[in-house]
Amino acid sequence: MTDSPIPAPAPAAKPKRAKAPRKPASHPSYSEMIVAAIRAEKSRGGSSRQSIQKYVKSHYKVGQHADLQIKLSIRRLLAAGVLKQTKGVGASGSYRLAKGDKAKKSPAGRKKKKKAARRSTSPRKAARPRKARSPAKKPKAAARKARKKSRASPKKAKKPKTVKAKSLKTSKVKKAKRSKPRAKSGARKSPKKK
């Protein structure tokens, strides 16, 4: 009798777990619906999340969790740069399409997105020279520091002048003291002459 393990039927169960293909949604993706809602509203200050939700619910057949899905897809569109937030912070506020996205449509939009991605690389290249310009600003800052130091150096030069003035005063005092002993010496000499 051998103790070899008997193969378990578990691997055969895995193919049964395969999910059935999803049913096609009765509406386009939430990001497309949001873009359509913002285009339809055409407000100058941007569209609020509430107005986007109203538009989506009235024009498309969406489920119970549409509000959450709209909120999440707005965040994704903001991160992707498709939308810009004009007012507010986070999920609250107003949104509008970025300038390049107004002409996009769903079938041709993907091709344009690829082109936009290529365009986005070229502004990044342009941003690199800007970074190169910033070191040019640093020498200006160093020059400003040098100017400050040069301004500080005359103050140091002024201090020796004050010391000189003090030395002049002390020398004058010494001269005056010397003159007094001379007078005394003259007085001493005069009695000897008598």
From Swiss-Prot:
Keywords: Chromosome, DNA condensation, DNA-binding, Nucleus. Residues 26-99 form the H15 domain. GO terms for biological process: chromosome condensation; negative regulation of DNA recombination; nucleosome assembly. It is found in: Nucleus; Chromosome. The keyword Nucleus applies. InterPro entries: H1/H5 (IPR005819), Histone_H1/H5_H15 (IPR005818), WH-like_DNA-bd_sf (IPR036388), WH_DNA-bd_sf (IPR036390). SUPFAM superfamilies: Winged helix' DNA-binding domain (SSF46785). Pfam families: Linker_histone. Gene3D superfamilies: Winged helix-like DNA-binding domain superfamily/Winged helix DNA-binding domain (1.10.10.10). It comes from the Eukaryota. Residues 1-31, 82-194 are annotated as: Disordered. Erythroid cells. Belongs to the histone H1/H5 family. Histone H5 performs the same function as H1, being necessary for the condensation of nucleosome chains into higher order structures, and replaces histone H1 in certain cells. This is Histone H5.
